[in-house]
């Protein structure tokens, strides 16, 4: 199932991407990276794990291939002790941010879309919230079975709801 999303906020347009690859990131881009990083730094120790990096990259709108994730994982394990701090994350992501083209979803757009579904603001999308959002946002009335199927596909941890990370994965398919 596809959900309509807004335009990208931090990725460069095709015409200027080549010229801009060597420029430093702007303050707004660094803040975008910081927001994304903090979303995945659950214990607030200033680090994210190697395994969370792929999900974090997807949150930012970058869709790494399996090979890229394997290579990054090896680099992180060898050079960074299996964990990435914010500075290392910026260093890893800067070339990707500068090289990507328009049409990708940024963290804020993803978070805004999630909030449209999570109407009570508790950080989880329930069956009822999904059904209401589909009707309100897309004009689609899904059956309870169809709603359950959407949640089941997205609900990685099996708790019956869709949290932000699961939402990002669902939107990345």
Curated annotation (Swiss-Prot):
Keyword Protein transport attached: no
InterPro entries listed in its UniProt record: CaBP1/2/4/5 (IPR043582), EF-hand-dom_pair (IPR011992), EF_Hand_1_Ca_BS (IPR018247), EF_hand_dom (IPR002048)
Subunit structure: Interacts with CACNA1C (via C-terminal CDB motif) in a calcium-dependent manner. Interacts with STXBP1. Interacts with MYO6.
The protein's name: Calcium-binding protein 5
List of residues binding Ca(2+) 3: 155, 157, 159, 161, 166
Gene3D superfamilies for the chain: EF-hand
Organism: Homo sapiens
GO biological process, one term: signal transduction
Gene label: CABP5
Zinc-finger keyword on record: no
